[in-house]
Amino acid sequence: MKRLVIIDNEDSFIYNIAHKIKEVNSFISIEIIKQEEATSSQIEQFDYIILSPGPGLPNESIGMMNLISEFYTKKKILGVCLGHQAINVFFGGRLKKMPKICHGQKTQIFTSSETYFATLYNSWCIDEDYLPDCLEVTARDNSDNIMAIRHKSLPIFGVQFHPESIASDCHKIIFEPFISL
């Protein structure tokens, strides 16, 4: 059985993430571990890591950044909102304040092959001028802000939006391919 851990960065939506993943694959085992309590030996047991949303900025979540450092070549990783930003920062990228703060705002997300709606709860996004060479953009919003990334050679992905939100219609588009790896 595949095992997935959600690293809880003090976000109230982590149980929504677990629920939406179970909708996509009811056979996957899911555990939630608080970021500050996660140990290497615990995380080593899992096939997949989801870095949850949360308050603050990536460099304020030292535990999460350490987990990325330790497991980025060993595990499949998906970052949501803060987790997405952390992946970017870990690989040398920078963030910028969004021109307009978005909290609970439904927006269109555009990929090369489809369009869907997702919900934003953030005031920061990836600064494209400092996007690391190892990452590529896979989705944008109406304002051309980066909304999704993937690593060019490792199974690492990030989404700025919240696919687990009730107002988002994209949880299957995001979670199904990730847990199929």
Task: Describe the role of every protein-language-model region.
Residues 1-5:
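Extreme N-terminal starter segment of soluble prokaryotic enzymes
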Residues 9-12, 19, 23, 32, ...:
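A generic "structured core" feature
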Residues 28-37:
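A short beta-strand-loop structural module common to alpha/beta enzyme folds
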Residues 37-46:
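Short amphipathic alpha-helix with an adjacent loop that forms part of the alpha/beta core around
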Residues 46-115:
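Cysteine-nucleophile active-site neighborhood
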Residues 81, 122, 162:
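Histidine-centered divalent metal-coordination motifs
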Residues 113-154:
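Catalytic beta-strand/loop cores that center a nucleophilic Ser/Cys/Thr
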Residues 166-181:
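Acyltransferase
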